[in-house]
Swiss-Prot record:
Disulfide bonds: none annotated. GO terms for molecular function: transcription coregulator activity. Belongs to the Mediator complex subunit 4 family. GO terms for cellular component: core mediator complex; mediator complex. It is found in: Nucleus. Residues 61-111 form a coiled coil. It comes from the Eukaryota. Transmembrane segments: none annotated. It holds the Pfam family Med4. Component of the Mediator complex, a coactivator involved in the regulated transcription of nearly all RNA polymerase II-dependent genes. Mediator functions as a bridge to convey information from gene-specific regulatory proteins to the basal RNA polymerase II transcription machinery. Mediator is recruited to promoters by direct interactions with regulatory proteins and serves as a scaffold for the assembly of a functional preinitiation complex with RNA polymerase II and the general transcription factors. This is Mediator of RNA polymerase II transcription subunit 4. Residues 209-228, 235-263 are annotated as: Disordered. GO terms for biological process: regulation of transcription by RNA polymerase II.
Length: 263
């Protein structure tokens, strides 16, 4: 096999083996008896071969040093390539994220363009917008959830039914047959009862009848007339109707003022 097809390591090992063989022949010829020594011509050829192998060894060692430097440069280049690969992968991930963001933005932009085109095809006058805004303000609705759509019953404020179902809406009704009263009024009743007891039966301060007014589950207010007289129903509808009329009048005035301002 030609030496050019061998690696540098194999060539070095082959040269060292040749030098070892030549050196062994020279040493054996030196210590051999005179009758067994080789001729001077053969000895000279072995010496020339040894010198040639030595030069070849030095050249191969120089080549190995050059190859070691090249290998070092290759390692440095591999490290740079690895770092560049990491940067490329990071940039690729960022490009993927940017592509996704751009795709989302384009989709949303197309939706907005479609909405604009639809709005341009069916324009709405300012008077209609003012009327619709007035309807919203008349119902005390100032905003709606972000996900609100046509037909959604949700409002940003509690309705009358929700307020009546709450604890505050039931504070003036009977619960389990007992009236809910303010703690201060209960304390005053106890103090009045104790004062009457201290003054005696002939005192000037009349005894206040507890539970004189009571709400029935039907919503009517009843006043107790005594132990044997029973109770009398009080009509509060007139006051409620008057309050409702006042509210309607105020709402009508505010509506007319809003319409005049908008015009």
């Amino acid at each position: 096999m030609s030496s050019y097809h061998l690696s540098t390591r194999e060539r070095l090992l082959a040269i060292i083996n040749d030098i070892e063989i030549v050196a062994k022949e020279l040493i054996e010829n030196t210590i051999a008896p005179k009758a067994q020594k080789m001729s001077s011509t053969d000895h000279a050829q072995l010496v020339e071969l040894l010198v040639l192998k030595d030069k070849e060894l030095k050249a191969t060692l120089q080549l190995a040093a050059e190859q070691a430097g090249i290998e070092k440069n290759m390692d440095a280049l591999r490290e740079q390539v690895r770092k560049q690969d990491e940067e490329i992968n990071q940039l690729q991930r960022q490009l993927k994220e940017a592509e996704q963001i751009l795709a989302t933005s384009i989709f949303q932009a197309r939706q907005k363009l479609a909405s604009i085109a639809k709005a341009n095809k069916r324009p709405v006058s300012s008077e209609e917008l003012i009327k619709f805004a007035h309807r919203i303000s008349a119902s005390h609705a100032i905003c709606a959830p972000l996900t609100w759509q046509q037909g959604d019953l949700r409002r940003p404020y509690p309705t009358d039914i929700e307020m009546r179902l709450g604890f505050l809406g039931k504070s003036d009704l009977n619960i389990n047959g007992h009236n809910l009263q303010h703690p201060n009024s209960l304390n005053e009743m106890h103090r009045n009862a104790s004062t009457v007891g201290a003054g005696g039966a002939g005192g000037d301060i009349p005894a206040s009848a507890p539970n004189q007014f009571a709400w029935h589950p039907s919503g009517e207010l009843h006043m107790s007339m005594g132990a044997g007289a029973g109770s009398v129903s009080l009509d509060t509808r007139a006051h409620k109707d008057a309050s409702q009329d006042d509210v309607e009048v105020m709402s009508t005035e505010s509506s007319s003022s809003s319409s005049s301002d908008s015009q």
